[in-house]
Amino acid sequence: MDGAHDMGGVPWSDPVQPEPDEPMFHAEWERRAFAITLAMAMPGGWNIDMSRFAREDRPPEDYLQKSYYQIWLAGLERLLLQRGLVEPDEIAAAKSLHPAKPVARTLTRDGVAAMLHRGGPTERDAKHPALFMAGERVRARNIHPPTHTRLPQYVRGHVGIVERVLGCHVFPDSNASGNGENPQWLYTVKFEGHELWGNEGDPNLQVSVDAWEPYLERA
């Protein structure tokens, strides 16, 4: 979807100013919000793409006024409400008011290290050969889906060169909507700065983007 989360290359956004010696968390509640989001994915039954969409699917004014982990917390609340694991009055009261709903799976403290070590591999067996090869010119499709996508707006409609073929991976657009993994070939595509930003762009700039096959067409 197009939204405030996709800010790369927009002319009105200020440069990112990294915080010197930035800590991983600025407050204890941020640490807890991060941990709860990871832990609740198991009983909640959502995947990483659903979680991303829950965070980004909000009005720009709401998204931009929230801090990073406030967005995470808002996304978590939405997922919990959608699955009936909490009620709106519990969110408002910030405490449990009703009997807990039964869940099929939980993540215990003893299982955290193994889960993080295992990770979440996304590569899958391919059902057909890759459509593109390294060195081939491709154009990023000018798409504007209303749901989750990993194709940045600033490359849409522009031509690049396939740098690498990365294998067949879970397709985020389908996975985020609950329509299955629908694995698709994934490519690293290199775009020249002048192609993205015009003649005023840095002539030495190149941007590489990982793009799934449905995002691309032959140039």
Segments (PLM) and residue ranges:
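Basic/aromatic-rich interaction segments and small domains that mediate binding to polyanionic partners
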Residues: 12-37, 79, 119-134, 142-219
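N-terminal intrinsically disordered, low-complexity, charge/repeat-rich segments that act as generic
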Residues: 1-102
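Basic/polar N-terminal segments that are highly enriched at the extreme N-terminus
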Residues: 1, 104, 108, 217-219
